[in-house]
Amino acid sequence: MIIPSLVFSLLAAFAMWVFVRRNPATDPRVTVAILALLLILPLLNFLPKYSVSVEGSLGTSTSLSPSILPSIWTLGFLFFGLRGLIDVLSMQRWNRESRLANDLPAFQETLCELAISRRVDLRIHPRLTSPVVSGLIRPRIYLPESSTDWSPQTLRMALLHELGHVQRRDLWMATLAHIVCVLHWFNPSVWWLRRTFLSQCEYACDAHLVEKGTDPNIYANALCDVAQSASAPPLSLAMAGHVPLRERIIFLSSGGRRGSAFLSSLIFLTAS
């Protein structure tokens, strides 16, 4: 199934590249559906197989030496699977290193604004540089220590963005995308699709906030205040890191279309 999965993922990646160029906020669920199909493809190997023996003058067939491909795949699978486990453990460490901040008024207000009834924790982490959300069963939003110095408007924008990921269940889809990458670790198209999915999640959250009435210029300023380069585990989503800040502000300023040179200049003025 290696060749079919390579061909399918390459064609799917090309199709997504075309769609994303036209609209970076293309629904991430489309990309996840493609990745889910790639997850199902290996299961076809377990379907019954039928072979027809042909008698002829070919002589006795010689046994082939076992292929090393399954062994190589297993090594890669174990390597990337172990990395995923380490990332899960690191998120548990984040929880121990941070302090709970659920009583923050802005947090309670944004929960009510988005009508989120499930349990979500807000925590302050001393070593983070940008907001991060993680957790499937009990989502947790981690803010950097510097968030105590943010303006009320910037804090509200950051919370709305991270809660948007919770509301859209992006973390569940991100976990599925990571599992597919572990199974298809040898396929660069799959990794590209996952990276595209993460970018789509950020663009979609940005677009959703603007559609709900958030002023794009105010939100762009909040991004400039908050979004520093952040490295987050694969099973979490960081407000910065997946999409360059400049690209996101151009997207906001252009109303969901690719920016022009004029808009690019506008971005630098906004960011400064």
Predicted regions and their residues:
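Membrane-embedded and juxtamembrane structural elements of multi-pass membrane proteins
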Residues: 1-272
